[in-house]
Amino acid sequence: MHRRLAYAAAGLVLAGTVVAPAAADSLSSVSVPRGPDSPGYQLRINTARLGISVSRGGEQVLRTASDAFTFDGGVATRVRSVSRDGATVVAEADSTAGRPVTLRITPRPDRFDLSWSVGGLAAGQRATHFDLATSGYWYGGGETSEGKAQPYPLSAGVVDEPEFSPASYMMQEPYFFTSKSVGLYVRTAQPMKVALAGGRADLTVTNSAEYTSTVFVESSRRAVYDDYIGEVGKPAKSDATDAEFKSPLWNSWAQYYRDIDQDKVLSWARDLKNVGVAGHTVQLDDKWESNYGNLTFDAKTFPDPKKLADDIHAMGQKFGLWTTFWVNLDSANYAYARDHGYLVHAKGNTSTPCTVTWWNGTAGIIDLGNPQARDWYTGNLRKLMADYGVDGFKFDTRFFDDRCATTGSLTPQDYQKLGADMTDAFDQQGAGIRTHWGNQHYGFVIRAVDADTSWDGLRTSLRRASAISADGYPFVETDMIGGSNSMPPPTREVLVRWAQAASLMPLMYASTSPVSTVDTTTGKTVVYPADTAKLYADAVQTHAKLAGYLKTQVQQAVADGTPIMRPVYFDFPTDHRFDTIDDEWLLGPALLAAPMITAGTARDITLPAGLWFDPHTKRIETGGRTLHNYPAPLDTSPMFVRVGAPGWTDLVRDLTR
């Protein structure tokens, strides 16, 4: 619909094809009336000390903190003037640094663009600060750093991310949303600093002359999500195959960590097959290489990799390898890559490779900004495929490091795109790549970062997967089932419950065998009770039963970006009981997952409105209430089919057969 802005001497009102009368407000107020696709909102600029507040339907839904706009050495203060530049409201303010601050707001029907800059100041830090009390709960942003809690909601805990960046290994996204259906999208290709604590949210951009953002104002969180996806793009495809949505990827990391060899890997794969635990791929993780960056097998531990690949293929599975873009200084390839200019340069000295410390030593990084470097690296990967029958790769790496210099005019965000484009040419085998910051359109599988082998690890991994999905990456999986943080292996109960929870997600990512594993802290073998394998296999079979339903959800995600694993409040926007519930989610429109993620054999389950069929008891439960102490013995993972939802009859058939 054609829209235009109508102005009056006293105010600014967004109108449709008919000019709406302007309210008797000052130029510092903006009123956007309700429309067929937007709830309308009112925005006011605080002139005593530069800041903004947003209201919808008479309720305040967003407000900046008292020090709303800060920069290197100063904070914006009193507003000197407010004017209009076409559709844009322009506020000029003083600052404690004696420099002018210019705020520009351009209203649109369901959002407004907000940017501000400081006169005469070079690029640096620009921060916008928000008051949490008026905006409800905060969500979004993706993963918090390893070793830190993943609060749910974010505002329920402390978030401190000084390296929130396009180059981060974490799945981070400059997008946040609230329980009052407001979204904040910070438009930057540069690293940020993000903090939520003490009743405020601090969103800081670095290396920037201007802070640029879009604020969505909607009537539901799902509408905010759709607005954001409209900006960054939906998945253009699903990188994962039907087989990868049906059974787990098996990766060697948590089973053996770095203590692997050809015989161990083959024994592990055969054990899984013998107990009936399905899988589509066996991947070698860390320590198959002769050295990090060599991209050649260690002949001592893998004397015949071609035979290993053939043996895995004979079991009906693909064979894959873990790889990174780090090239260790003591590797055979480092000198070659350095001498040919294939490594990212150091800041301030483009003749010297940047040296970084990562979890396996000190290394240079393949420069994806150099086409010759990319060709050399991918040529090595294709040689592994041709020589040994390797089918694909787990790319476990950063595409750039903020400690280094970018090539030419490239930004850290550009390196994300270069890495995504390069890896998209290979079979990622359901491990996907951890690419973010506006890379939703690739349709990659995204795995949550490494988690502890405990109940807390399970909960944290589910929270992270949920956060990634709510940022527009629908093809998600937890960390390896049972966790993978170089700790003692999971208990039988944690391992089984993790498998059950993962079975009610888009994909399953596995490592620890339910037959036996190795305690990396002692070197001793841990043998699980005999029924563990059956319980695990049952979870995998449950996931297989969802294959047809999931295929439909994948098609929907590609069509319009609809998340597959999603918060219940996306489909039930007025049920605020789910604002803080992290152990229930919807898998598509028809399946409510409520797995056990704590020790025990019963739990409380919150049901949304409607009728819900329990595939285990074959009873229909009435929604809009909480089922207290609902039975969940170890062989049962609670789930409910929403009667009348798209696909519900097929789900009932498949889950009860």
Residues of each region from the PLM?
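Catalytic and substrate-binding clefts that recognize carbohydrates or anionic sugar/phosphate headgroups
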Residues: 30-242, 263, 269-274, 571, ...
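Conserved, mostly hydrophobic/aromatic
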Residues: 40, 175, 250, 272, ...
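Generic recognition of flexible, low-complexity loop/linker segments
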Residues: 161-164, 171-173, 237-239, 270-272, ...
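Glycine-rich, histidine-containing beta strand-loop boundary motifs that form or position
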Residues: 47, 56, 93, 105-107, ...
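Catalytic core of carbohydrate-active enzymes
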Residues: 421, 441-448, 461, 470-478, ...
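Aromatic- and carboxylate-enriched substrate-binding clefts and catalytic-loop regions
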Residues: 129, 144, 151-153, 278-536, ...
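Secretory targeting and sorting signals
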Residues: 1-24
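N-terminal structural segment of carbohydrate-active enzymes
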Residues: 141, 240-285
